[in-house]
Amino acid sequence: MASIPKLVILLLCTCLHTLAHGGDDLRTYKVLHAGALKSATVNCSQPQVTPSSGGVTVPLHHRHGPCSPVPSKKAPTLEEMLRRDELRAAYITRKYSGVKGGAGDVEQSDVTVPTTLGTSLGTLEYLITVGIGSPAMTQTMLIDTGSDVSWVLRQSHEGNSCSGSQCQYMVKYGDGSIGAGTYSSDKLALGSSAVNNFQFGCSQSESGNLLEDQTDGLMGLGGGAQSLATQTAGTFGKAFSYCLPPTSSSPGFLTLGASTSSFIVKTPMLRSSEVPSYYGVRLQAIRVGGRQLSIPASVFSAGSIMDSGTIITRLPATAYSALSSAFKAGMKQYPPAQPMGIFDTCFDFSGQSTINIPTVSLVFSGGAVVDLVSDGIILDSCLAFAANSDDSSLGIIGNVQQRTIEVLYDVGGGSFGFKAGAC
């Protein structure tokens, strides 16, 4: 197995420079400072840029970061995270292609109880803290836009559980973990707001690694009937947003009822009745160094989803090849490094005090251009994108590419919104 390159943190300098590479070929670059991991600054205070008004906001933290509200076991290595990420991406792709079986299959009793819980929890990275019950018991929960039903472990909650076999559920995950329990309802406290009769699962038995740390459960932000967004639609208008921090050493936020009018950059949201949990988006083009890559529009015809739980963005094979080639062309001054897991475009930054990387932008339908920050382009010295096996597989916009951007899910209005530099 190839050794892992020394982890470096790339801190974005506030300026952008236009550098000449090869005659008159001008490309736009981000100028970065390379430093050791130990030099990372921990700042657990609220983001300096306030979220959109009009709703309730709760802090959001990385599961394994120093700002996490719960004790965590040793953080997984990047290679471990990428392996888990492959499983999640493969599951989502299978679900869209109509293949049955695998993670998230649910065994139900006589009456249909919605229990679409998503995939292996090991891929989920971000936490919020809420209160459930009267008086409220604090619950620290993973968030997932690919799951509908929220649930907590029974030992962390004793609520008004419904009775009868019709409310029992069982969920199986791809890693062999199983959770079973009762579908319940109770009061949910979100910051200064409260939601009465919030429905969620109360897990009464678990096997395998259902949760690897002291997290209490999962908050489903998917598009189905039992998700948090749908259950609170009467109060918050079926709109929510989040901002994922640039590193695990700083916080982000989750807002319910985000002000949709404050987002200028928008693109249509695509939905499928066959897979209602997921939020579709149409990626149309990719820009590197300010220049749009020559990728046929048909390459993106399989569509993509926006997902908080998938770590790395998956692109059609042809699109990824064009991105990788253009990025390498702009990084000729740095020696190539050994591939790492799903990353095949890596560089050796040894001895570098500053690093110049080409800008990368994603262009969505309707002309929405989303410029990625440095932490959304480079991860551990590698280009932070991965290729699908072909162009017919679903694309996934992962959470690394969403960092520092407030991403609006205006489910009621049928659109996504993007606001740069929100956390």
Located regions from the model:
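Short conserved beta-strand and strand-loop elements enriched in small hydrophobics
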Residues: T129-I132, S185-S193, S241-C243, V288, ...
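Flexible, small-/acidic-enriched active-site or ligand-binding loops
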Residues: P251-S301
